[in-house]
Amino acid sequence: MATTSSFDISTGADLQEVDNAVNQTVKEITQRYDFKGTKCTVDFDRDKAEIRLAADDQFRMDALVDVLQTRMIKRGVPVKNLTVGDVVAGSGESVRRTVTLTQAIAGDIARKITKAIKEQGFKKVQASILGDEVRVSSPSRDELQTVMAFLRGEDFGIELKFGNYRG
C-alpha cells in the first residue's frame, strides 16, 4: 500500500523580528547625524502587519526606507514580503509612506504556484490550495524534493516557506 507524502507552502514573517527591526531602525535614526533635528518616525502596527513611516522630506524618506530594509535583512525578515506603498505628501515638505507585510499567500499567487507545479509535469504530484497555504502531495518523497527545488528557483514575488513535511 502506497502512502502519500506531503508538505505545505506558506509565507510570512516573524512579527517579533519585525518589531526588533523597527526598534533598531528607530534607534539608528535617533543617533544618525543626517537625522538630527528631524521629525522622522517609524510606527509598527502588529494587528494590521504594517509599518508607517513619516519623514521631513523625500531624501530622508528614502534613507529611512533603506535603513528599515537593512535592519529587516539583518534580522532575517524576508524583504520580498514587504510592499512599500506610495509616498503621500503631508503638510509642508513632510511625506508619509506605509510598508505592508505579506503574512499569507494570496489566492492569485497560490493559483500561480499550483499552475507552475502542474505545468512542469511532475509525476503523480498534486497541488491544492488550503486557505492561505498550498499543500503538495505525492507518493514519492523524491518528487516532493524535486518540487521544492523547482519552487526555490521560481520567483512568485514572495518568500516561500516549506513546512509540515509528512512522509
Where are these predicted regions, by residue range?
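Positively charged, low-complexity, intrinsically disordered RNA-binding extensions
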Residues: 3, 7, 96-167
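Short, hydrophobic beta-strand segments
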Residues: 5-11, 48-55, 92-101
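Short amphipathic alpha-helix segments
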Residues: 19-34, 68-69, 106-118
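Short edge beta-strands and adjacent turn/loop segments
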Residues: 36-47
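Helix-adjacent hinge/juxtasegments
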Residues: 60-98
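Short, conserved charged micro-motifs
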Residues: 16-18, 59-64, 105-109, 143-144
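N-terminal, positively charged regions that mediate nucleic acid binding
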Residues: 1-37
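Short glycine/threonine-rich beta-strand-turn micro-motifs
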Residues: 45-58, 130-139
